[in-house]
UniProtKB/Swiss-Prot annotation:
This is DNA gyrase subunit B. The gene is gyrB. A type II topoisomerase that negatively supercoils closed circular double-stranded (ds) DNA in an ATP-dependent manner to modulate DNA topology and maintain chromosomes in an underwound state. Negative supercoiling favors strand separation, and DNA replication, transcription, recombination and repair, all of which involve strand separation. Also able to catalyze the interconversion of other topological isomers of dsDNA rings, including catenanes and knotted rings. Type II topoisomerases break and join 2 DNA strands simultaneously in an ATP-dependent manner. It catalyses: ATP-dependent breakage, passage and rejoining of double-stranded DNA. Belongs to the type II topoisomerase GyrB family. Gene3D superfamilies: 3.30.230.10, 3.40.50.670, Histidine kinase-like ATPase, C-terminal domain. Keywords: ATP-binding, Cytoplasm, DNA-binding, Isomerase, Magnesium, Metal-binding, Nucleotide-binding, Topoisomerase. It comes from Bacillus mycoides. Few gyrases are as efficient as E.coli at forming negative supercoils. Not all organisms have 2 type II topoisomerases; in organisms with a single type II topoisomerase this enzyme also has to decatenate newly replicated chromosomes.
Amino acid sequence: HAGGKFDGGGYKVSGGLHGVGASVVNALSTELEVFVHRDGKIHYQKYERGVPAADLRVIGETDRTGTITRFKPDSEIFTETTEYEFDTLATRMRELAFLNRNIKLTIEDKREHKQKKEFHYEGGIKSYVEHLNRSKQPIHEEPVYVDGSKDGIQVEVALQYNEGYTNHIYSFTNNIHTYEGGTHEVGFKTALTRVINDYGRKNNILKDADSNLTGEDVREGLTAIVSIKHPNPQFEGQTKTKLGNSEARTITESVFSEAFEKFLLENPNVARKIIDKGTMAARARVAAKKARELTRRKSALEVSSLPGKLADCSSKDPAISEIYIVEGDSAGGSAKQGRDRHFQAILPLKGKIINVEKARLDKILSNDEVRTIITAIGTNIGGDFAIEKARYHKVIIMTDADVD
C-alpha cells in the first residue's frame, strides 16, 4: 500500500481505516497513470493491472503543484458495469465542498452527455444546513454555527430549526459520513438537551412544575451537521459508519455546549423560539400518549359501539374476514346491501379525513375517523403495533381519488 496514513507528516487527519486507496484503485484498473506536479517538474508513471509499465520519469516542467490520476476500471473484475454515475459522484463532491469551507471542487463528464458542476461554499457546513433546509420554513433566519478544538480534535457544528416535526442530524468524522452516528453525535445531542433545559429554567421559560424537555422534544424540527476532525479515529466495523472514540463525546459536548450557551444568551429571541418549539413538542408527546391509550380496546367486542358505524361480519376468523372502508353513509348503505355478511365488514367514514403525513401524532389520534379505523382493525399503532391482532386479513379502501 501507499502507506500515507502511517507517516506522521503525511496527513493531519485521514479516514484511518485501510490506508490503501491508491493501491486498490491501481490493482482494480487495466491501466493507471499518475502525473505529479512538484518542485517545478512533472513526474509521470504508468501502471497496467497494478504493475509499473515503466520507471518513474520526468516528462516536463511546471509552475503548478498537484496530482492528476487517470484510471480505467477493469471490466474483468467489475463484470456488471464500469460506468460511473455523474449524479452519485456530484453528490459526494458537493458534500466534500460543504465539509471543507472554501475548497473548490469541479466535476466534469466528458462522455456523450457532457456536463460540468463546480462546488464552492464559503459558509461550509453552515451553507450545508441552509441547503438542507431550502424547502422548509426556518424559525430563525441564520443557522447557528459553532467551531472549536481541544486536544487536537476539531469540532464544527451548524444547526437551524424549522417549522417541521422531524429532525435531520448528519454527522461526519474526517469527511466520512458516519451514518450510524457515534460518540461525537451523542455528545452533541446530550449538550443540546442540557443547554436548552438549563437556559429555559434560568430564564423562567420552563416553570418549576414543568418537566424537563426530552432529547426528542428539543430535536423536533432540527437540521444539524456535526463534523469533527480527529487525528486517530476509531470506527466501529469495517464500513466505518459509527465513531467509537470516547474522548470525541466529551470534547464535542464541551465545545458545543460552551458556544451554544453563549449563542442563546446573545440571541434571546431565537432562544425563546427554540424552547417554545420544544415545549410544544413535549405537549404533543404527552397528548399523543393519552390519545394512544384511548385507542387501546380491551376486547374486540367494544368495536360494535364505535361512532364509525362498523357493520361487522359474523365470522371471527381473521383469515377469511375482510373490511371495506367506504366514504360516507350513502356508500355504506349500498355496500351493506351488496356484502356477504358472513365475512365482509363495512366501515363508513364521514367527513374529510386528516392528512396523516402532515400532522402531529396527537392531532392524528384526536381524529375520530382515524381512531375508528385503528380500533376496528385491532392491530394498534406505533410501538404497540401487533399484526397478529388484526381482526381482518384484508383491508379494502374504497374511495375516489380526489384530494380528500
